[in-house]
Regions:
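Flexible, small-residue-rich helix->loop connector segments that border functional cores
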Residues: 159-166, 179-192, 206, 216-222, ...
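Surface-exposed or secretory-pathway low-complexity segments enriched in glycine-proline
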Residues: 508-509, 519-552, 560, 591
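Substrate-binding/access-modulating region of protease and related hydrolase catalytic domains
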Residues: 146, 150-152, 161, 169, ...
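Active-site-adjacent substrate-recognition loops and nearby beta-strands
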Residues: 242, 268-269, 274-276, 301, ...
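Protease zymogen maturation seam
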Residues: 35-50, 64-155, 163-169, 173, ...
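Acidic-leg catalytic submotif of subtilisin-like serine proteases
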Residues: 70-73, 134-209, 226-231, 235, ...
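C-terminal subdomain of the subtilisin-like protease fold in secreted/lumenal serine endopeptidases
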Residues: 281, 286-295, 301, 333-334, ...
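Hydrolase catalytic cores
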Residues: 229-232, 258-265, 281, 289, ...
Length: 606
């Protein structure tokens, strides 16, 4: 334990009530971090206390009496959040079904043998994943990895079950508290209020991180935290297992995972507000730039931001503290990313639905909403979470790392849920911050979030008719309800780079206006050329070099992918000025082509 037991506050009016209520313990909710106590007090977090009562005490009456004391500003019950998944995990076995011949023949960007099964990163439309799989229903990370695969200076706090920090595909990307690792066992060597927090901390038991605690019925840990961590940053290009979105290139350059354990077996404190709040503040005080949290309250539990902020104030205050903390030169605050919820309700669950946090919905390999995903108000963006009901096995769900102790001896397994969509978003955000560092860019939090939420592909054209999954889904109900679109890692990096993106469809010739690149008079300019490398044309299956027609780009892509193209025009007149002839000047624009399904006229917004 890191905190001593006290029962009185030292304020007479408060202590009278505490004595009357037989309070068994009273402690500061947030332990003293000597390095950050001034900031803690400035944020008012030092005023939060956690009270425990004897079992026979009427808690409603206790809250009523305490709230009547002038010195007490807020009373909050220690409610629980839950994991956003369906409770089922399927181990990856050595006899797992083979992928199709086409998928097996692909030259993959990294040598991790199971990357071919991670459709959620690179989806080639393999029918071995699902008969309805669509090429491009992924996060478009393959080309992004050529620009960056992560940066160790970016720390992602996984607030979840404990992460198995000894996992062979995670160990190299775990955040390490070097002061504690090289210090004295049983001593708070870095003064942050926690003892022996080597890779993070177990806020439920106030002790070491665990990932394999179950009771006699098998209830308890499930591997959920290790699975979400692997999606963010399983080690890439190490010749084993799977890849992580921001897991590096095999050169010790992945982002780092901090395990902030908020669920532990069947312990009474698992997922409570007190535990969550401490985990969020710890992440801020110890260097994290992103909170990855695939947890929440069932949709409808809260129905407005004000209601959530009032009734979950300790948690909300801790998240506000995290948001106000800059731990990375690329951004002036922290990013908070939650799953939207698995209740198939027409609203997101809180905390994710709160306006300052990113709430992630889920799609499956068919580029359609997953059967379980929440949608509607409070939902910001969509990412792959899988859908077990569209395939005869688990291939249509998300493959990631698992603790072998919980997974029939396998280090890898499949899960589905907005819990699985959420870490894809956290991984893409981590890639974006990594690339911003590489480019020497700095953004406000709002600027970065705006780029993140507009780096999307359109799913709207598919939302007609029905989908057969866990029952019949009427797809029109999801129109404009899943967020801004399906997250696209490459588009985010292009926004950071400053290279504009042109979204086109696949399979049909298109005339694409260039107004957004050449201005309102783009159709009236004289264009002198279009250039594109043979390699880039091959990436998109372009057989004939694109041309300009009627002031628009004439292009036909037959493959999903990304590539660069350059268009040259004359600014002023129809010829370029020379030493002897008056004329205009050459204007050259390079942009990235994103070929992903068919692009709607709304620019990619759902």
């Amino acid at each position: 334990k890191t905190r001593s037991v006290a029962t009185r506050a030292g304020i007479v009016s408060v202590d009278e009530i505490l004595s009357e209520l037989n309070v068994s313990s009273l402690n500061r909710l947030f332990p003293v971090d000597t390095r950050n106590e001034e900031r803690t007090r400035a944020a008012g977090l030092h005023r939060w206390y956690e009270l425990q009562f004897d079992t026979e005490v009427d808690l409603d009456l206790a809250a009523q009496k305490l709230s009547a004391v002038a010195e007490v500003a807020n009373i909050q019950f220690n409610t629980k959040l839950e994991k956003m998944w369906d409770g089922k995990a399927t181990p990856l076995r050595s006899d797992a079904p083979a992928m199709s011949a086409g998928t097996r023949s692909i030259v993959w960007p990294f040598n991790d043998p199971e990357l071919k099964r991670q459709w959620h990163y690179i989806n080639k439309g393999d029918k071995a994943v699902a008969q309805t799989a669509r090429e491009g229903a992924d996060i478009n990370v393959e080309e992004a990895w050529k620009l960056t695969a992560g940066d160790p200076k970016i720390i992602v706090a996984v607030v979840d079950e404990g992460v198995k920090y000894t996992h062979p595909d995670l160990a190299a990307n775990m955040w390490v508290n070097t002061r504690e690792m090289t210090g004295t066992t049983g001593v708070d060597d870095d003064g942050n209020g926690y003892v022996d927090d080597y890779y993070g901390y177990n806020f439920v038991t106030n002790g070491p991180i665990s990932w394999d605690v179950v009771d006699a019925k098998g209830d308890g840990d499930s591997g959920h935290g290790t699975h979400t961590a692997g999606t963010v940053a399983a080690v890439n290009n190490n010749g084993i297992g799977v890849c992580g979105v921001a897991g590096g290139s095999g050169n010790n350059d992945g982002v780092r995972i901090m395990s902030c354990q908020a669920l532990s077996g069947t312990a009474a404190g698992s997922g409570t507000t007190a535990v969550m709040a401490r985990a969020f503040k710890y992440a801020a005080d110890n260097g994290a730039s992103i909170i990855q949290c695939s947890m929440g309250i069932k949709g409808g539990g809260y129905t407005s931001d004000d209601q959530y902020a009032k009734n979950a104030k300790a948690e909300h205050d801790a998240l506000a503290y995290f948001i106000a903390t800059s731990n990375c030169d690329a951004i002036d605050g922290g990013l908070v990313i939650f799953s939207a919820g698995n209740d198939a309700l027409d609203r997101a669950g809180y905390p994710g639905a709160f306006r300052d946090y990113i709430s992630v919905t889920s799609f499956s390999p068919d580029f359609l909403p997953a059967s379980y995903t929440n949608y509607g108000p409070g939902c910001n963006i969509s990412a792959p979470g899988g859908d077990a009901y569209i395939a005869s096995n688990s291939t249509a769900t998300v493959l990631s790392t698992m603790p072998s102790e919980m997974n029939e001896g396998s280090d890898y397994g499949y899960m589905q849920g907005t819990s699985m969509a959420c870490p894809h978003m956290s991984g893409v955000a981590a890639l974006g911050l990594s690339y911003a560092l590489k480019q020497g860019k700095h953004y406000t939090r709002n600027e970065f979030i705006s780029m993140l939420l507009t780096s999307v592909n359109d799913m709207e054209r598919y939302l007609d008719g029905t989908k057969e999954s866990n029952g019949t889904m009427y797809l029109e109900n999801y129109r404009k309800q899943l967020g801004t679109g399906a997250v696209d890692a490459y588009q985010l990096l292009m926004q950071i780079e400053g290279t504009p993106c042109l979204k086109v469809g696949v399979g049909a010739e298109e005339l694409v206006p260039l107004t957004q690149f050449f201005g309102g008079s783009a159709t009236n300019l004289t264009y002198t050329g279009v250039s594109m490398s043979a390699a880039d044309m091959a990436k998109l299956g372009i057989e004939t070099l694109p041309t300009m027609a009627y002031g628009k780009l004439k292009i036909k892509c037959t493959k999903s992918g990304v590539a660069k193209i350059t268009v040259t025009a004359i600014g002023g007149g129809d010829k370029v000025g020379t030493g002897t002839v008056m004329g205009g000047m050459t204007i050259t624009k390079e942009f990235a082509i994103i070929a992903r399904g068919v692009q709607a006229g709304n620019g990619g917004w759902l």
